[in-house]
Amino acid sequence: MALNLRKNHQILKIINDALIDLPTPSNISTWWNFGSLLGICLITQIVTGLLLAMHYTADTNLAFSSVAHMCRDVQFGWLIRNLHANGASFFFICIYLHIGRGLYYGSYLNKETWNIGVILLLTLMATAFVGYVLPWGQMSFWGATVITNLFSAIPYIGQTLVEWAWGGFSVDNPTLTRFFALHFLLPFVIVGLTLVHLTFLHETGSNNPLGIPSDCDKIPFHPYYTIKDILGFVLMLSLLVSLALFSPNLLGDPENFTPANPLVTPPHIKPEWYFLFAYAILRSIPNKLGGVLALAASILVLFLTPLLHTSKLRSMTFRPLSQILFWTLVANVLILTWVGSQPVEHPFIIIGQLASFSYFTIILILFPLAAALENKLLKL
């Protein structure tokens, strides 16, 4: 009898065990689509990014012109650039929904998978930040200046660290060239981390909406979830292409159409929309070091969620108090995002401070308390 190549070939066997014969819970919902959507985002970004890198020049005198040249003179260069810029937004939409799913359904109890996921988020944020500097527009330059300057808040070594990162005494040509190198490298680091993420995930298997073990009721990934994922791909790519074709600058900052000028500061320096919630937390503390610590904590707090799980139920499906807190947290992050886009003046300052305070309070104090209370109420 001939061997089944798919199940016996060393490399095909790995693909088979991850994408074809993978035992998957029979009841996972569309919220479980975002992992594969993130994979598609990553592939799209690497392909479009590679095509852009072929025409880009990492030099302060030429960077802005090289991007303009791409959009005007390269075949479909405008489309590739628009797909790449808006693809980053979709990447963040998917990752935030993916993390929200993990928080709601208790997926963070797969600790290794969760921790690698948080590291992936940090790497993605670093990649997006260095990428935003490359077109060398006003917001690129000033964003790079403001955000890298935050490291100077680190006691004793801060200033040295910043000048080392800049490669000089201000953001200049050495900064741009190293940011381009990093922006090229980091997506491949993300690919490597993704494989580690999947390795740990397939060690335990996927969680499911009920948060209970589903070993007795597993179905093969293919064809059931391959077809479901393909529907997700089609929907997301349709949205991405629509945004890139109809309204490519909707999520960008008009300030970035002006070439970088160190002598003129833009009236409102703000990052891309996907960093605004963290930026609002940074601004809500009137002390530089305190703000930087709060900024770091806003993401690093995710490492603590598995340790703060006090409920005897894994998922929030049957926990109404935790559900109310969860959706309050979602609304809170949206408020932070809005405040981050507003100027630093009354009433935005106090709104930002209240929203920042409640962000940490919900995650660190109210979630564990509500879960403990629910254990009592449900007599668990």
From Swiss-Prot:
GO molecular function, one term: ubiquinol-cytochrome-c reductase activity
Statement: the UniProt record of this protein carries the keyword ATP-binding: no
GO CC entries: mitochondrial inner membrane; respiratory chain complex III
Record InterPro entries: Cyt_b/b6_C, Cyt_b/b6_C_sf, Cyt_b/b6_N, Cytb/b6-like_sf, Cytochrome_b, Cytochrome_b_C_euk/bac, Cytochrome_b_N_euk/bac, Di-haem_cyt_TM
Primary location class: mitochondrion
Note accompanying the cofactor annotation: Binds 2 heme b groups non-covalently.
Keywords carried by this UniProt record: Electron transport, Heme, Iron, Membrane, Metal-binding, Mitochondrion, Mitochondrion inner membrane, Respiratory chain, Transmembrane, Transmembrane helix, Transport, Ubiquinone
Membrane topology (UniProt): Multi-pass membrane protein
Binding annotation for heme b b562: 84, 183
Protein name listed in UniProt: Cytochrome b
Cofactor: heme b
Annotated TM spans: 34-54, 78-99, 114-134, 179-199, 227-247, 289-309, 321-341, 348-368
Keyword Electron transport belongs to the record: yes
Subunit structure: The cytochrome bc1 complex contains 11 subunits: 3 respiratory subunits (MT-CYB, CYC1 and UQCRFS1), 2 core proteins (UQCRC1 and UQCRC2) and 6 low-molecular weight proteins (UQCRH/QCR6, UQCRB/QCR7, UQCRQ/QCR8, UQCR10/QCR9, UQCR11/QCR10 and a cleavage product of UQCRFS1). This cytochrome bc1 complex then forms a dimer.
One annotated GO biological process: mitochondrial electron transport, ubiquinol to cytochrome c
